[in-house]
Amino acid sequence: MNLNQLIIAFLAPRDPAAYTDTAIAQRLNASRMLDRRCTADEVAIALCDLHKLGLVRMNVNKLDDITVWMITPDGAREWARCGRVTVV
């Protein structure tokens, strides 16, 4: 699976929870489902790509300027279409 698919596999089963790019990168690295470690910056770029496709959405907390990401209904459908793989 590629990074985008794994991000969806991480977020979809945890809906409606939201996570930072750093938290997502840490969890993906801990899962060892990628062939190499990913950085928070790589995850942030992938999240922006997924956002453009309507598969994730972001929410910026205006008090502390932290961006969190969550799955959209379209993202959940894509996750189901791909076999509902879950990142634990």
What positions do the PLM features span?
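Short acidic, hydrophobic short linear motifs in intrinsically disordered regions
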Residues: A18-A30, L34
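A short, conserved structural fragment
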Residues: H51-N61
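N-terminal positioning helix adjacent to the helix-turn-helix/winged-helix DNA-binding module
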Residues: N2-I7, T39-E42, T67
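Short, amphipathic alpha-helical interaction segments positioned at domain boundaries
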Residues: I71-V88
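Short amphipathic alpha-helical interaction segments
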Residues: D35-L53
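Minor-groove-contacting beta-hairpin "wing" of winged helix-turn-helix DNA-binding domains
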Residues: L63-I71
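Short alpha-helical segments that sit at the start of domains
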Residues: M1-Y19
